[in-house]
């Protein structure tokens, strides 16, 4: 599925501007040089139009003037708009300024910065997102966990397990995306210790992956069958109903057998 966050960020950026249709029309007529010059203005509205123009232009050359203006200081709403524009541009060159913003005093700014890091995927993104797993804000911690899953940061597995154990539920789907067969034992150790509604997303991701061997999936289903709770029966039923595997697929058959045993 294509990443829709840059589209959403652009829509949010436009929505921040008063009289959005008028401002958008004006921004569309601005060149890169003009937008860059607007960022040097002391006028809130001019800076706002300059930021929006750079997002609409979509040029990688917009990253440097945006980063410079961010470092010079911006009003809170303009800072958020500038980060959203960097997200729209999706360029790795934005990494240094986004790393700086990921430690900003305001959690709203840190959240946007973490989301932008995941979208831009600069070098060092995995380290920055792993650090953000310990942020004081639960929203930032959750965004960091989601980002690690999205960028495929397999080096973050241990950090994600720790975050999951410490109550960051968003680490669950990331673990489901990133766990390798050798990590599955650790995933299964969480069953019965972590609420199953949080484990459900981990298992759904894990069982749905094509790169996970059938043998590993069979081990997961065998452990679920041992626990044999009604909610596990429901989960397995939903898994079978959503599966596109043929009737003779060993994983599907194991799930169906487990459903029958749990129902007795």
Feature map (PLM): residue ranges:
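Bacterial N-terminal signal peptides
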Residues: 9-21
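Boundary at the C-terminal end of the N-terminal hydrophobic targeting segment
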Residues: 22-27
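Amphipathic alpha-helical scaffolding segments comprising HEAT/armadillo-like alpha-solenoid repeats
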Residues: 28-38, 59-71, 91-103, 122-134, ...
């Amino acid at each position: 599925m294509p990443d829709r966050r840059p589209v959403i960020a652009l829509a949010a950026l436009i929505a921040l501007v008063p009289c959005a249709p008028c401002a958008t029309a004006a921004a569309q007529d601005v060149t890169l040089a003009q937008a860059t010059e607007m960022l040097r203005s002391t006028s809130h509205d001019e800076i706002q139009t300059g930021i929006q123009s750079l997002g609409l232009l979509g040029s990688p050359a917009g990253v440097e003037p945006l980063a410079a203006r961010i470092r010079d200081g911006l009003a809170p709403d303009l800072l958020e708009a500038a980060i959203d524009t960097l997200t729209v541009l999706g360029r790795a060159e934005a990494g240094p300024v986004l790393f700086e913003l990921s430690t900003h005093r305001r959690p709203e700014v840190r959240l946007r910065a973490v989301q932008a890091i995941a979208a831009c995927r600069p070098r060092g993104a995995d380290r920055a997102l792993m650090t953000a797993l310990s942020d004081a804000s639960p929203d930032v911690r959750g965004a960091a966990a989601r980002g690690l899953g999205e960028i495929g940061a397999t080096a973050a597995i241990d950090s994600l397990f720790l975050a999951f154990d410490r109550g960051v539920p968003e680490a669950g789907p990331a673990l489901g995306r990133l766990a390798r067969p050798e990590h599955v034992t650790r995933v299964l150790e969480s069953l019965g210790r972590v609420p199953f509604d949080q484990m459900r997303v981990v298992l759904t991701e894990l069982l749905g992956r094509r790169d996970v061997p059938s043998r590993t999936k069979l081990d997961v289903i065998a452990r679920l069958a041992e626990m044999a709770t009604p909610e596990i029966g429901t989960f397995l039923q939903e898994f079978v109903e959503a599966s596109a595997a043929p009737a003779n697929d060993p994983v599907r058959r194991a799930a169906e057998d487990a459903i029958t045993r749990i129902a007795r």
